[in-house]
């Protein structure tokens, strides 16, 4: 997650009363180390303010790890059904849908977890380089296309957030960029078969843009 994206999320959630958010399920959370040390702005801009407002948070990921409260596969219907019966009032899912084979199917499952009147906040790349975790399908919808994934929700607010360029990212965290370049040089290929490193070079001066949407569920699924 990029800094400008985290700030947008934090500000959007700050405009919703805490009792309408709690408990919140953070889908694709990563570990506590990721949220608090590798990308500390995630906790600083999003989760620390929520905790201060009394919002209960549960972190969900497909893997186990420190700071992950729940782990499971979103393709497992029984697991998703259990989540739907857990009483969550809101859901956060950032930069996950580009890493699944069928983003529409996963979006529909996540929409069902939250009851009518609850809130869902999603982000997904709009214009962003290839980044496998473990795959990247290069799903890069427009904001309008993204909102259409959630037919039972109304858009509260949305934006295509400009998050800087690759050069900005190099200046902020060169060690992370070096690791990414090293991985691409090892021969990872992006969707369609183009070498990742070669395709990344234009992004040094091209804007990273992220679709950010806050939705309110208005209709039952």
Segments (PLM) and residue ranges:
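Class I SAM-dependent methyltransferase Rossmann-like catalytic core
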Residues: 1-21
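Short N-terminal helix-initiation segments at or just after the protein's N-terminus
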Residues: 1-8, 33-40, 153-154, 158-160
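Short, flexible hinge/linker loops that cap or flank conserved catalytic cores
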Residues: 18, 51, 205-206
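Conserved SAM-binding loop
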Residues: 22-132, 143-147, 215-217
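Helical cap/lid subdomain of alpha/beta-hydrolase-fold lipid enzymes
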Residues: 1-4, 27, 195, 205
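S-adenosyl-L-methionine-dependent methyltransferase catalytic module, highlighting the catalytic core
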Residues: 101-115, 119-221
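Hydrophobic, Leu/Ile/Phe/Ala-enriched alpha-helical segments that form helix-helix packing faces
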Residues: 12-16, 50, 150
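A structural signal for well-ordered alpha-helical scaffolds and beta->alpha junctions
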Residues: 2-9, 39, 43, 139-143, ...
């Amino acid at each position: 997650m990029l800094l400008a994206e985290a700030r947008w999320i934090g500000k959007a959630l700050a405009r919703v009363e805490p009792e309408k958010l709690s408990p919140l399920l953070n889908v694709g959370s990563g570990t506590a180390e990721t949220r608090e040390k590798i990308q500390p702005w995630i906790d600083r801009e999003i989760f620390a303010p929520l905790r201060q407002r009394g919002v209960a948070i549960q972190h969900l990921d497909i893997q186990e790890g420190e700071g992950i409260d729940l782990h499971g596969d979103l393709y497992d219907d029984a697991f998703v059904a259990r989540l739907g019966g857990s009483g969550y009032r809101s859901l956060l899912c950032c930069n996950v849908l580009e890493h699944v084979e069928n983003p529409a199917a996963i979006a529909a499952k996540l929409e069902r977890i939250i009851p009518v009147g609850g809130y869902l906040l999603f982000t997904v790349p709009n214009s962003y380089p290839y980044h496998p975790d473990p795959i990247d399908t290069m799903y890069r919808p427009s904001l309008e296309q993204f909102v259409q994934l959630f037919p039972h929700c109304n858009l509260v607010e949305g934006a295509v957030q400009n998050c800087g360029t690759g050069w900005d990212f190099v200046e902020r965290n060169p060690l992370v960029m070096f690791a990414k370049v090293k991985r691409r040089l090892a021969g990872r290929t992006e969707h369609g078969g183009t070498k990742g490193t070669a395709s990344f070079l234009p992004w040094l001066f091209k804007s990273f843009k992220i679709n950010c949407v806050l939705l309110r569920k208005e209709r039952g699924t």
